[in-house]
UniProtKB/Swiss-Prot annotation:
This is Protein PRY1. Present with 556 molecules/cell in log phase SD medium. Residues 103-157 are annotated as: Disordered. The SCP domain is necessary and sufficient for lipid export and sterol-binding. The lineage of its organism: Eukaryota, Fungi, Dikarya, Ascomycota, Saccharomycotina.
Amino acid sequence: MKLSKLSILTSALATSALAAPAVVTVTEHAHEAAVVTVQGVVYVENGQTRTTYETLAPASTATPTSTATALVAPPVAPSSASSNSDVVLSALKNLASVWGKTTDSTTTLTSSESTSQSLAQATTTSTPAAASTTSTPAATTTTSQAAATSSASSSDSDLSDFASSVLAEHNKKRALHKDTPALSWSDTLASYAQDYADNYDCSGTLTHSGGPYGENLALGYDGPAAVDAWYNEISNYDFSNPGFSSNTGHFTQVVWKSTTQVGCGIKTCGGAWGDYVICSYDPAGNYEGEYADNVEPLA
């Protein structure tokens, strides 16, 4: 079986004038034969926020190999911004994210010169008024398993403050769910994640590693805060209808029952972007058809 071939590519643009289009999302749904691209544009017209969608020409056949998700904390709008700015920046919190199984997903968040250099820390992941396009992965019968990679583990007493706090936050969230075991820290995963983080250029563009692991990315959060932001997507998850949703992929990877190990890396970018965090998971989560068995309800 193959991984469900789904990638979502989002770019969010914030300018001082907030001229239309304010937010653009592009969703690629890769089936066995081809990739269909749907572009959604969120814009403000006569004081009203509107969304339009357009199906673009199919792209070439995709062969993604890994699971990857990302989350960006957007810059805060200046105090003089109009109410339309608030609407658009609220949309950015959820739309500037990437979820999927991909080797080449990219998220770009561009801040204008008039944008504040501080970052908004997300406290909720509820869906904004500006809608985004959601695709459901093509059905598969893939059995969850990671690539054949041995992961050396560390005892909690050997961990750095960053590793200890991120692992503890993951396990705190997992403990809230029925029959969901704690994760152990993997030095192999952490080394992979840190190597990738060290090469990040702090540009505000998030590009997934395309490696063999599950992957969550965040920009503008420290380690524990990134885990909190990912987990807060639980508010959008429908336990009565388990499955894929573009705005719950971070949450489902954090609590994925079959995942046993995690390792994370961090790079301090400073300025507008703050910290860049990447967490790798083994075995990877978010397999189509396995949500009911791996995303348990609250205890």
